[in-house]
């Protein structure tokens, strides 16, 4: 530890440079990761916020909830088996100032209400709870909003981060929803569904039980956005490994005479190796921790309309991957360190 720290202080400008590079790479990785998570939440947060593990939909080759039409006789059979109320959905358009906003309207379902950020859930037929992203347009609890057809609705509450396929969710009471939407898609979010109950539901003609992954994999925007963003993150980790590998390898070559002298006076290779690993960990941790602090600060400053989301688990994952990448990137330096011959390094072989 002492040798590693003394060397960092002696070559401080070189190590500051690599810390800055790691800092910039860390910021880019965390920002793109936060963007990927934010876009993902805009696609599936409505499902993530539910307590259900499975969903009953119309039996289609591609299980898309907006296309799930379940007939009344099928609904009666499903409700007899599951005891669950149906979740109904219909697209609507809000008029906000001079702009129009496409939203997904849902009814209120017992035990499956999205988390409320402010206000209360709608109880009257003319009340709605809106997704918090719509507050960026200046809408708050107590305000009135209009649908495209001119019908006015009062905002009773604000839902916390509830969206589906990039559309904000607007919740109404069951009676209010039925009055306003003559046609709607229907699904049944179910929790603790036993194997026998699932088999009974699947035996109902025209419906089937699906998992959340089955549904999210069929959202076109979800797959189209996540694949390139995840590829960018992987590419940045590869670039980080190459940069760190080149830096520490060059540093090792430049220190060959010093390494030779240390080996000649009896210092074991494992001590030199541990010093190198400590240097890698110190430089990587400092750069990554600062980048985490910067991104965390930015996440609080970004507007609610920005699709950006970071979690503690995601931040810890990135830190862990960076450390692994740094160690992998320094393998060439480890090999060079083992191969240094003390006599040749100090010129004794001439």
Swiss-Prot record:
Pfam families per the UniProt record, alphabetical: FtsX
GO cellular component, one term: plasma membrane
Oligomeric form and interacting partners: The complex is composed of two ATP-binding proteins (HrtA), two transmembrane proteins (HrtB) and a solute-binding protein.
Cell location: Cell membrane
Role of this protein: Part of the ABC transporter complex hrt involved in hemin import. Responsible for the translocation of the substrate across the membrane.
Taxonomic lineage of the native organism: Bacteria, Bacillati, Bacillota, Bacilli, Bacillales
Name of the protein described by the UniProt record: Putative hemin transport system permease protein HrtB
Transmembrane segments: 16-36, 233-253, 275-295, 315-335
